[in-house]
């Protein structure tokens, strides 16, 4: 399993991820990985991925989906998993090694500019594309990773109204605190930046994709082992 890295000039959003969010995400890995498995399971059942395929996993995070994809494509296939956070990638490498997976490569890079080879059958992202600083640049470069006939699937959050696990805590907080100012640091456009289907359709079309299809997924979400854990998680990562 290769551990080569791609060095990029980090944007302020990448800096925010590495300096602010990585320690929090690491602390609550049991929620951010375990709590999202139902979304992946519903999608993975129908992914057009088989033995021998070459796959990219964009914004791979802790690497759990990359490892699942590596098992799916088997020893004759390969997975290129890319993320901007070294700490996340280290978890992926360690977990892959522990599970005997050697057909996945974890790379540090900016998906918007990474020099993908146009040789992949499939490109996947779970809750990664919504944080692109330039969505069209990121989506276009994901398409550049695909060979003719390749397919891209991404999972993104719908509107906050459809996600009370974040929406309700935000409403409560705003009863007592003002919203963040314009100069507040952030991780980028945010988790709900791709909630508008019409807008995302245009982004995909501009990026060169053909006949985009949207599917609504409703799945349970674990937000903590117990009430105290859920509250601590929201205070750390929520509104």
Write out the residue ranges for each language-model feature.
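C-terminal helical/coil "lid" or tail adjacent to the Rossmann-like core of SAM-dependent
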Residues: 2-31, 213-239
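Class I SAM-dependent methyltransferase SAM/SAH-binding core
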Residues: 54-114, 137
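Conserved alpha-helix/loop element of class I SAM-dependent methyltransferases that forms part
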Residues: 34-53, 68
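A short acidic, Gly/Pro-enriched loop at the edge of an enzyme's catalytic core
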Residues: 112-123
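Conserved catalytic/acceptor-binding region of the Class I
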Residues: 136, 147-225
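A short SAM/SAH-binding and catalytic strip from SAM-dependent methyltransferases
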Residues: 121-136, 158
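Helix-to-beta-strand junctions that scaffold the AdoMet/dcAdoMet cofactor pocket
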Residues: 74, 132-133, 146-148
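A structural alpha-helix within SAM-dependent methyltransferase catalytic domains
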Residues: 44, 67-70, 93, 136-143, ...
């Amino acid at each position: 399993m290769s551990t080569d890295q791609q060095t990029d000039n980090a944007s302020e959003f990448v800096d925010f991820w590495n300096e602010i969010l990585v320690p929090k995400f690491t602390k609550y890995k049991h929620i951010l990985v375990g709590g999202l498995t139902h979304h992946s399971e519903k999608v993975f059942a129908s992914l057009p991925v088989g033995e021998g395929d070459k796959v990219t996993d964009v914004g791979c995070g802790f690497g759990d989906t990359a490892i699942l994809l590596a098992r799916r494509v088997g020893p004759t296939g390969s997975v290129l998993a890319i993320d901007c956070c070294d700490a996340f990638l280290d978890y992926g490498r360690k977990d892959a090694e522990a599970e005997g997976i050697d057909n996945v490569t974890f790379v540090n890079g900016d998906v918007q500019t990474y020099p993908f080879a146009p040789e992949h059958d499939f490109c996947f992202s779970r809750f990664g594309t919504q944080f692109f600083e330039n969505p069209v640049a990121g989506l276009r470069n994901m398409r550049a990773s695909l060979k003719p006939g390749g397919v891209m699937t991404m999972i993104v959050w719908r509107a906050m109204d459809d996600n009370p696990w974040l929406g309700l805590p935000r409403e409560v907080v705003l009863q007592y605190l003002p919203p963040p100012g314009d100069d507040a640091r952030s991780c980028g456009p945010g988790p709900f930046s791709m909630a508008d289907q019409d807008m995302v359709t245009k982004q995909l079309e501009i990026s060169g994709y053909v006949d985009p299809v949207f599917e609504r997924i409703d799945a349970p979400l674990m937000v903590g082992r117990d009430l105290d854990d859920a509250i601590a998680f929201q205070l750390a990562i929520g509104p």
